[in-house]
From Swiss-Prot:
It is found in: Plastid, Chloroplast. GO terms for cellular component: chloroplast; small ribosomal subunit. Keywords: Chloroplast, Plastid, Ribonucleoprotein, Ribosomal protein, RNA-binding, rRNA-binding. PROSITE patterns: RIBOSOMAL_S12 (PS00055). It comes from Pinus koraiensis. Belongs to the universal ribosomal protein uS12 family. Part of the 30S ribosomal subunit. This is Small ribosomal subunit protein uS12c. Residues 9-40 are annotated as: Disordered. GO terms for molecular function: rRNA binding; structural constituent of ribosome. Pfam families: Ribosom_S12_S23. HAMAP family: Ribosomal_uS12_B (MF_00403_B). The lineage of its organism: Eukaryota, Viridiplantae, Streptophyta, Embryophyta, Tracheophyta. With S4 and S5 plays an important role in translational accuracy. Located at the interface of the 30S and 50S subunits. One of its GO terms (biological process) is translation.
Length: 117
């Protein structure tokens, strides 16, 4: 326990909570432009995205197959990918240049698919 004199000399510092998605700067989503990431793996689809806030982040492309190329404009939301270290963002499908997932029947809202007629 510190003495009162020690507390007067230097007060207790409040603990700062660190954000899990700092590049979004407190916004729910942000827009960005894609640059392809190095391995362009067939196993996991990720993209380097330059945000309007100036950050360069790695974002995961959910769902089967995608139409994204270099200079595509995408919307990015928070949410990490467990087995990919350093990937803390998801690209929102069905908005801007990211097309919805084809022939999706269940969990459609997560992949930007409209209700089938």
């Amino acid at each position: 326990m510190p003495t009162i004199q020690q507390l007067i000399r230097n007060a207790r510092q409040p603990i700062e909570n660190r954000k899990k998605s700092p590049a979004l700067r407190g916004c729910p989503q942000r827009r960005g432009t894609i640059t392809p990431k190095k391995p362009n793996s067939a196993l996991r689809k990720v993209a380097r995205v330059r945000l309007t806030s100036g950050f360069e982040i790695t974002a995961y492309i959910p769902g089967i197959d995608h139409n994204l190329q270099e200079h595509s404009v995408v919307l990015v939301r928070g949410g990490r990918v467990k087995d990919l270290p350093g990937v803390r963002y998801h690209i929102v499908r069905g908005t801007l240049d990211a097309a919805e997932v084809k022939d999706r029947q269940q969990g459609r809202s997560k992949y930007g698919v409209k209700k089938p007629k």
